Amino acid sequence: MTEAAAQPHALPADAPDIAPERDLLSKFDGLIAERQKLLDSGVTDPFAIVMEQVKSPTEAVIRGKDTILLGTYNYMGMTFDPDVIAAGKEALEKFGSGTNGSRMLNGTFHDHMEVEQALRDFYGTTGAIVFSTGYMANLGIISTLAGKGEYVILDADSHASIYDGCQQGNAEIVRFRHNSVEDLDKRLGRLPKEPAKLVVLEGVYSMLGDIAPLKEMVAVAKKHGAMVLVDEAHSMGFFGPNGRGVYEAQGLEGQIDFVVGTFSKSVGTVGGFVVSNHPKFEAVRLACRPYIFTASLPPSVVATATTSIRKLMTAHEKRERLWSNARALHGGLKAMGFRLGTETCDSAIVAVMLEDQEQAAMMWQALLDGGLYVNMARPPATPAGTFLLRCSICAEHTPAQIQTVLGMFQAAGRAVGVIG
């Protein structure tokens, strides 16, 4: 990699000669100033990190230094699995580098059919539709299901892709307080009974790593005659007896109308999907704009996904290692005095809560300098006034790496003044 290519894109100091009232980018002046203030403090830009080399699911080279990865969503560590890599290479040789078309035209290859069958087998459903990204899966299915005159009822802390799907579909949007069964019941009860309704939930919420009380929420939704969609992006592979997600872990098989997921986390590649047992589910392909009007995934990508999904069906040891690592990290950080996003280890996400952006940036920088990469998160990705470092644990982290990580957090926390 050349030195120039390794540098993140810089914002120009001087704006083009356009009158401010006609400059479409002037709305971002506050954001630009805030970013510059952060960089002027001497902190590396936390939102422009370059992986110069990736050595394994848990190690990379960043800024010329060997770094433990604790912020990649690579929960099951499938990115370097030999069988997964071999499947991608074979498809690349057999079908070429891309499809040059949408799924509705020439963009469905043998491996697209194979990955959708793998999803049906994994989830035990009759239907599966693959999208080019997880974001597009939510954007596509929500905007297609719920339109004008219909209602989408969603958690206030829902992912941006869920909100964008609501807006694209032009449905009425009703928000309820995060993880509040009572507020969900109240909001649904106030709506007219006649229009169709879709309740959108997430198994694991990606910022704090907390899980939804799906059992109670699904019961409320069904009481009010609403259909239910659950996004299991951050739980696929290691929640429930078959790794299907939080809904399976809470005994809700057969009660969820649509399950959304992604390939970019536990599966270890890129893409998104929706699975369902609804008898009319295939009609989504004929009406879903984000499915129809975009190029399909390259054959090598869906081939790797197929192999990974089938291996995840029996990845019992990996699941146990992931949960063991998550409990060790959560428990260790809590014992040191860090304030965490959840009281108990609820998922493979551990959020370290901090006072403000300055403290979060200093802590993040201290960890990076010590050889550890985590995600720094701030509004609007987090709730207003919430600043945190998000740790995503991997099944391939060794016990020794987890202990090293705990030592890094202790040293950085003391240096910054987060812990005593």
Curated annotation (Swiss-Prot):
<comment type="similarity">
    <text>Belongs to the class-II pyridoxal-phosphate-dependent aminotransferase family.</text>
</comment>
<keyword id="KW-0808">Transferase</keyword>
<protein>
    <recommendedName>
        <fullName>Serine palmitoyltransferase</fullName>
        <ecNumber>2.3.1.50</ecNumber>
    </recommendedName>
</protein>
<dbReference type="GO" id="GO:0006665">
    <property type="term" value="P:sphingolipid metabolic process"/>
</dbReference>
<keyword id="KW-0012">Acyltransferase</keyword>
<keyword id="KW-0663">Pyridoxal phosphate</keyword>
<feature type="binding site">
    <location>
        <position position="234"/>
    </location>
    <ligand>
        <name>pyridoxal 5'-phosphate</name>
    </ligand>
</feature>
<feature type="binding site">
    <location>
        <position position="264"/>
    </location>
    <ligand>
        <name>pyridoxal 5'-phosphate</name>
    </ligand>
</feature>
<dbReference type="GO" id="GO:0005737">
    <property type="term" value="C:cytoplasm"/>
</dbReference>
<feature type="binding site">
    <location>
        <position position="262"/>
    </location>
    <ligand>
        <name>pyridoxal 5'-phosphate</name>
    </ligand>
</feature>
<dbReference type="InterPro" id="IPR015422">
    <property type="entry name" value="PyrdxlP-dep_Trfase_small"/>
</dbReference>
<comment type="pathway">
    <text>Lipid metabolism; sphingolipid metabolism.</text>
</comment>
<keyword id="KW-0443">Lipid metabolism</keyword>
<dbReference type="InterPro" id="IPR015424">
    <property type="entry name" value="PyrdxlP-dep_Trfase"/>
</dbReference>
<keyword id="KW-0963">Cytoplasm</keyword>
<feature type="modified residue" description="N6-(pyridoxal phosphate)lysine">
    <location>
        <position position="265"/>
    </location>
</feature>
<dbReference type="InterPro" id="IPR001917">
    <property type="entry name" value="Aminotrans_II_pyridoxalP_BS"/>
</dbReference>
<dbReference type="GO" id="GO:0016746">
    <property type="term" value="F:acyltransferase activity"/>
</dbReference>
<dbReference type="InterPro" id="IPR015421">
    <property type="entry name" value="PyrdxlP-dep_Trfase_major"/>
</dbReference>
<dbReference type="Pfam" id="PF00155">
    <property type="entry name" value="Aminotran_1_2"/>
</dbReference>
<dbReference type="GO" id="GO:0030170">
    <property type="term" value="F:pyridoxal phosphate binding"/>
</dbReference>
<feature type="binding site">
    <location>
        <begin position="134"/>
        <end position="135"/>
    </location>
    <ligand>
        <name>pyridoxal 5'-phosphate</name>
    </ligand>
</feature>
<comment type="function">
    <text>Catalyzes the condensation of L-serine with palmitoyl-CoA (hexadecanoyl-CoA) to produce 3-oxosphinganine. Exhibits a broad substrate specificity concerning the chain length and the degree of unsaturation of acyl-CoA.</text>
</comment>
<dbReference type="InterPro" id="IPR004839">
    <property type="entry name" value="Aminotransferase_I/II_large"/>
</dbReference>
<comment type="subunit">
    <text>Homodimer.</text>
</comment>
<dbReference type="GO" id="GO:0009058">
    <property type="term" value="P:biosynthetic process"/>
</dbReference>
<dbReference type="InterPro" id="IPR050087">
    <property type="entry name" value="AON_synthase_class-II"/>
</dbReference>
<dbReference type="GO" id="GO:0016020">
    <property type="term" value="C:membrane"/>
</dbReference>
